[in-house]
Design a protein with these regions (language model features):
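Alpha-solenoid helical repeat scaffolds
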Residues: 235-239, 269-273, 303-308
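Structural marker of alpha-solenoid helical repeat scaffolds
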Residues: 229, 263-264, 297-298
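Cysteine-nucleophile protease catalytic domains, especially the papain-like/related folds used
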Residues: 26-114, 118, 189-193, 205-209, ...
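Active-site-adjacent substructure of cysteine-protease-like catalytic cores
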Residues: 107, 111-160
């Protein structure tokens, strides 16, 4: 799905478009106004939000620059244009928005596709970047905006959108426009912070993607936060060990991998990685034992474990 800048869709008669946007049943809005989630205040607006007015068709770079700025990453929309804007589509793909957030030092991750989840993120201090369709489903006009607040009593959502800062929109209208994107939304968070509404697999996938091109120490902080939220999760423990190693902290890496082997005694990758790091730390006996366990577990990691064991033995002989 692509997000196109405003102004490209065929214009509809104003009355027809108004009826389209406001008609129907905004079920999530009605439920929220009837009973807000526990702990969610009736009204909230994030303070000191950066604002960038979009250029023609470039709502993606502007919205992402605002979300990144709120996370402490100061980058101008113009610098994001080559990273996310596709001239032939006159818009930005969601996958590029997530990748660009990570490339610039923030954890870009989707949130749960629900209005209550959006409000929970705002309560946590996370502005939410949303994709809307401001026109007909059959003739979409995709648009990125940043949600910065809400008022349940008034039934309003507050956005930084297009060239308008602090745009107030009826929550029911917002829900209709957002629903047409499948309720797609993301947050861009500084290292060590996690979305409050995203599930474990969504966060893990985002961290793995960030690990590929992010600074190891930054990604490590977010892995550590996720490991605290979901203790004992193998993927998070391995990621924590990998990023600690990449950041130059071999003792920290060994600790993460060791905890992974204790929680998952049948994980060949955990034992193999532990063996590799222990060897570099000079603990050859423990390294050989870990590599032997990885080898004994067999499976697709058998060849890798054999290579690790041979590397350990060569290193040990070289020290004699």
């Amino acid at each position: 799905m692509e997000a196109r800048g405003a102004g490209r869709a065929r214009l509809l008669p104003a009355l027809a478009l108004s009826a389209l946007l406001l008609g129907g049943c905004a079920t999530q809005t009605a439920a929220l106004r009837a009973a807000a989630p526990p702990g969610v205040p009736p009204r909230l607006e994030l303070a000191a939000m950066p604002f960038f007015a979009q250029e023609r068709y470039q709502c993606g770079p502007a919205a992402l620059a605002m979300a990144l700025g709120a996370a402490g990453v100061l980058v101008a929309p113009d610098a994001l244009v080559p990273q996310v804007y596709l001239p032939e589509r006159e818009g930005s793909l969601q996958v590029e928005m997530l990748a660009a957030a990570r490339r610039n030092g923030a954890l870009g991750v989707t949130i749960a596709p629900r209005l209550d989840a959006l409000l929970e993120e705002l309560q946590a201090g996370h502005p939410v970047l949303v994709l809307q369709n401001l026109s007909l489903p059959i003739f979409p006009r995709w648009h990125y905006a940043v949600v910065t607040g809400y008022d349940l009593a008034q039934g309003d959502i507050v956005l930084n959108s297009g060239t308008t800062e602090h745009m107030v929109m009826a929550m029911s209208t917002f829900e209709h426009t957002w629903a047409r994107s499948g309720y797609w939304a993301m947050v861009a968070l500084p290292p060590g912070q996690l979305p409050v509404s995203s599930d474990k697999q969504t966060v893990l996938d985002a961290l793995v993607a960030w690990e590929r091109n992010g600074k190891p120490d930054a990604v490590r902080h977010s892995y550590a936060a996720a490991d605290r939220r979901w203790p004992g999760e193998l993927g998070l423990q391995l990621g924590l060990g990998n990023t600690a190693y990449a950041a130059g902290d071999r003792a920290g890496a060994a600790d993460a991998f060791r905890r992974a082997t204790l929680a998952h005694p049948d994980s060949a990758p955990a034992f193999n990685n532990l063996a590799f790091v222990l060897s570099e730390l000079g603990d050859y006996g423990a390294a050989r034992a870990a590599a032997g366990r990885a080898l004994a577990l067999g499976g697709p990691w058998r060849a890798e474990a054999q290579a690790t064991l041979e590397t350990i033995e060569r290193a040990e002989r070289g020290r004699r």
